[in-house]
């Protein structure tokens, strides 16, 4: 499902002494099935932007066209848009409320008017895709789970509604390295299983480099960079000027390059760096 944002501006508390422009004439197009990362320093406008795409905030001016429908129009039922655009907030485990995992995940699909068989099918599929065995976990209380497992339940609750667009606000925030890896792997599987359009908000450049196809960079309410991983992370000076950085491994390979090692500069993941460094070592061994 395509998303087109045209001249979007949002002003908090207009006309008051606390007036603040959070979005300033933003123009973005996202194609059906894209995996887009949204990055920016705290206060850059990321969260405000994603809440507009879900219809939680009303634009001060501009248009948001989702699947051909302008959701800023007064005639549009936002409840219908939210069935198509799922939003998983940061620390979504705080939104869990039911006595069992199955009931919690089933809450959304039930409100779509599905029958019991359809709801059960969606719950099982969503649990499977986030790595929670249905028979093992369905009757457990979500409050007895680890942080990473709670996060999976919360994501499954949105996924079970089978939205066309899934927005994830820092899905790996606060998790240990293993939990972080697991969640990111599940997000990749969601993209493959449902062919969703995914928008990932993240502060981690390493996470973005691993799984996103395209990166949007926000600063002071504007989208200042838009491109592939390679295109955006090659703009080191611009990123650093707005309080961001490239992945740490990129700084490492650039340091090696400056010492005249024959290694590409545009490396953004540990896996890529490992492969290139192994090539260097093997090449050095051949000359010995």
From Swiss-Prot:
Residues annotated as transmembrane: none
Protein location: Cell membrane
Residues holding ATP: 40-47
Enzyme Commission (EC) number: 7.-.-.-
Topology class, membrane: Peripheral membrane protein
Main location: membrane
Xref: Pfam families: ABC_tran
Keywords noted in UniProt: ATP-binding, Cell membrane, Membrane, Nucleotide-binding, Translocase, Transport
Domain of life of the native organism: Bacteria
SMART domains: AAA
Cited function: ATP-binding (A) component of a common energy-coupling factor (ECF) ABC-transporter complex. Unlike classic ABC transporters this ECF transporter provides the energy necessary to transport a number of different substrates.
NCBIfam families associated with the record: ECF_ATPase_2 (TIGR04521), PRK13637.1 (NF010158)
Sequence similarity: Belongs to the ABC transporter superfamily. Energy-coupling factor EcfA family.
Protein name: Energy-coupling factor transporter ATP-binding protein EcfA2
Organism annotation: Clostridium novyi (strain NT)
